[in-house]
């Protein structure tokens, strides 16, 4: 690494950036601690002439043939053509790699990004500019730790190109404004500090640049996935597990706890017939193997995957809701995509709030009810009860919790594409987060479900999910499959795209979409909303009935139309596909 020079800046961020570029101290990486701030400032820079016409032409040539397939992609393309990059964990991998390639080619004088820089992205940077030193860590706002600061600052300076790297830390806005007012001879009013807001000053900056990094604390858990990998290794499972635990950096007491955890996990896997002991060892001295009737390349990558595998065995494959139940089980053990879940919750609360306001409910009562609304959690009660029973025989499961949700299930139920999800919930900054979640669900489905539990509908869902992922960004699948094959994926594999399949290619999903649209009709009829119903029909059919006239005899005899869960049953709809295979 090259030596670093540190500066504390009391100039507005725009002045700092332009001054650095005029001094020839680019390329710059401006660190923000939220994705919104990074994108907002990047858009501000579009009004600043950062590049020449010739540089813009070079960028346009580099972008030729690249597929900006999402709403965020359109915004990104515009930024790149102004010489501004954006980089954060919520982006699709293909967009992050594009920004990195352009930066490596020297085409981007400025990149606005988050502290993902600290994990070592492949971008050559001369100057790192901290827009601030306070971040929200998921629980509270705090000053960045010394180790975090040094990890990010250490990316400044290009080995082999620079003799030094430059790190700038911006003063808080109120300090900058106070200095400006003093220079103008004005009296600056002291602003009241907002609750929970953390500030910093030059002493904070000096401490971060000179203090020793915090001590790293080792953390380790034994998981079913780790045990399966140890079972696949040559040699005795006991010795392999002992070697892994005793060579870790945790304390002796923690090592003993890990050994007990590993024993409980193995006993649970054996009892569930996931693994089997041999009477005689294999040639490579393995005494344990994965049971033959489980999926090829079985992967229990989520901590509660063994529980999910056990729960799947009790589901009825003949149930019309079986595919959706499987999705709910899988989604309950996959890591939460919080930006999407919070957006789902917000949408449900807004819809309910409008109904309560129309009904004249008091503000206090309305807020109390809205506080109880969360994102959709199908099978939450059933899964929670089953997990409590499972824990009685598998104590290791007590340290993990389920997180029921409905993302892939909602997409299947409503026939939604990736773009539909992003647009419906307004989360274009979280496209990468959502795609990673969908990919995790796909991989979990593919590697978890026993062969006898894979129905035609499940195969259709798997095919659809793979197609969806490949259309949006193939790199996640390419990297996963290359990792399993023990190699590094090529750029061609990462960047490969596939054309979208015809809607009718996947019969299960096509029929679900038909049922969803038809139940939307029923719901509107139940509300006697013939106007919206007519507008819906205009979008999907050339000819449609006069719903007011058609429903008049019904309303003359009945008071309402049921729209409960039972009303959604597939038994109430018949789909005729006999006309030369068309539906």
Label the predicted regions.
Residues 45-77:
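Alpha-helical "lid/cap" subdomains adjacent to substrate-binding clefts that gate access
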Residues 69-114:
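Conserved helicase ATPase core of P-loop NTP-dependent helicases/translocases
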Residues 1-49, 78-89:
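Conserved interdomain linker/interface between the two RecA-like ATPase lobes of SF2 helicase motors
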Residues 1, 25-26, 81-82, 108, ...:
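Short glycine-/polar-rich loops that comprise or flank the Walker A/P-loop
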Residues 123, 127-183, 187:
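Conserved segment of the helicase C-terminal RecA-like domain
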Residues 85, 104-105, 189-582:
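Non-catalytic terminal extensions of ATP-dependent helicases
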Residues 1-3, 9, 34-38, 91-92, ...:
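Conserved nucleotide-binding/hydrolysis micro-motifs of P-loop NTPases
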Residues 96-97, 101, 107, 111-129, ...:
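SF2 helicase motor core recognition
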